[in-house]
């Protein structure tokens, strides 16, 4: 379980992230959504321990060693796709070939990272995170450079593995269909605040005025 209490983080300018209370139960898959600059990446960095809060606390069952975090621009090691993914494996029992197939990387297994396109590189980093079998995954726009068809396949692989392993997921995305596909709950942010936090099935009927406006924009973008 992840519990956030009285969290505050002042960034440059006037932006302050302020989350009074947030609880993410074990095994939940939470899609983190909102406009650019709403605080999604900031919240992920704080939970991941990349940044320290100015106030408040974040409580996680287990330790930082149980959390896998992928930022928007993840680091890639030199060498092949296979080497990169193996470096992310915490358990040698992982079926690497099955994971490569799930992520559409079988044909790229021996390709050098330097020769990959942006979308291929992002798929590789995504597969590397799945290879870790983390109890908790924090993913910041992990499929933003991937085409829609490939994204649908990767979303399915993510959900399947999370359900199979009981993984807790917190993933930011700007795509409505993706948020609905991967999540059991949706967290909507604006100006560093949590506006809505509800079951995915109920999100299309928001309580707040901002939520209603946001949903209307989503409908236009579908």
Task: For each feature predicted by the language model, list its residue ranges.
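H-loop/switch region of ABC-family ATPase nucleotide-binding domains
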Residues: 173-174
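Conserved catalytic motifs of ABC-family nucleotide-binding domains
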Residues: 73-83, 87
């Amino acid at each position: 379980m992840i519990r956030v209490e009285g969290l505050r983080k002042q960034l440059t300018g006037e932006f302050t992230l302020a989350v009074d209370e947030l609880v993410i139960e074990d095994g939940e898959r939470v899609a983190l959504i909102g406009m650019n600059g709403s605080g999604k990446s900031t919240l992920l960095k704080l939970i991941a321990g990349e940044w320290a809060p100015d106030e408040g606390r974040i409580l996680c069952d287990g330790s930082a060693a149980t959390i896998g975090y992928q930022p928007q621009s993840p680091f890639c090691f030199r060498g092949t796709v296979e080497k990169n993914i193996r470096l992310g494996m915490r358990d040698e029992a992982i079926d690497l070939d099955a994971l490569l197939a799930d992520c559409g990387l079988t044909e790229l297994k021996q390709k050098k990272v330097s020769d990959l396109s942006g979308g291929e590189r992002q798929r590789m980093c995504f597969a590397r995170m799945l290879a870790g079998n983390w109890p908790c995954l924090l993913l910041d726009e992990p499929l933003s450079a991937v085409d829609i068809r490939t994204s649908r396949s990767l979303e399915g692989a993510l959900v399947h593995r999370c359900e199979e392993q009981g993984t807790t997921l917190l993933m930011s995305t700007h795509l409505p269909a993706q948020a609905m596909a991967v999540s059991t709950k949706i967290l909507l942010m604006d100006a560093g605040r949590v506006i809505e936090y509800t079951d995915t099935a109920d999100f299309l009927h928001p309580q707040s005025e901002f939520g209603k406006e946001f949903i209307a924009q989503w409908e236009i973008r579908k």
